[in-house]
Amino acid sequence: MATSLTWHDVLAQEKQQSYFINTLEFVGKERSAGKTIYPPQKDVFNAFRFTELHQVKVVILGQDPYHGPNQAHGLSFSVRPGVPAPPSLGNIYKELASDIPGFEIPRHGFLQSWAEQGVLLLNTVLTVEAGQAHSHANLGWETFTDRVIAALNEQREGLVFLLWGSHAQKKGNIIDPQRHHVLKSPHPSPLSAHRGFLGCKHFSQANQLLEQQGLSAIDWTPRLPEEA
């Protein structure tokens, strides 16, 4: 396992590609034109800032960022402190409460403590226009995040990928199941959670898979910075 590579090494090449330059240019122009784009510019690449390539243990794929005020901050499913947990995250907490002994549902939806333990919270599209779900789909972000997943697949071994819903599962087709652990279920959204997300036990399974490799388990209780 080559642990010396960083996200900077892996992604520097992508940043030279025309598709990536065009994507950032489009988003920059939208912001300049006065449109509200989430997350704020400084937070777009937070998934990579909080979880370095060699630290990744678990990958949770989301779709695109939350498009309501003060929600998105660059980590899939997570919202800023002080913002109520959206419905999908509420179902994630519900599953954790039934899966992990002693888990108590927190009053916040800030998942940065997961990221700091090696859970890469990656959306497949990294920006969105306020109030317009999927408005930045097919701009080029999907190509970028495909390259990210390919880098994880090739540079690391024994990662646990949690793929919830058909979008994430299709995205995960490039993952080699001989090198990594791939757990699949329906999406935690209220539309589909009852079809098999609730009861999937992915969080305890992920910890078992990590411990079998001699790695520390994830503390799935999300902690605000002052609780750390």
Swiss-Prot record:
GO terms for cellular component: cytoplasm. One of its GO terms (biological process) is base-excision repair, AP site formation via deaminated base removal. Pfam families: UDG. Transmembrane segments: none annotated. It is found in: Cytoplasm. CDD domains: UDG-F1-like. Its main location: cytoplasm. It catalyses: Hydrolyzes single-stranded DNA or mismatched double-stranded DNA and polynucleotides, releasing free uracil. Its EC number is 3.2.2.27. GO terms for molecular function: uracil DNA N-glycosylase activity. The keyword Ribosomal protein does not apply. The active site is at 64 (proton acceptor). Signal peptide: none annotated. PROSITE patterns: U_DNA_GLYCOSYLASE (PS00130). Keywords: Cytoplasm, DNA damage, DNA repair, Hydrolase. Excises uracil residues from the DNA which can arise as a result of misincorporation of dUMP residues by DNA polymerase or due to deamination of cytosine. Belongs to the uracil-DNA glycosylase (UDG) superfamily. UNG family. This is Uracil-DNA glycosylase. It comes from Pectobacterium atrosepticum (strain SCRI 1043 / ATCC BAA-672). The gene is ung.
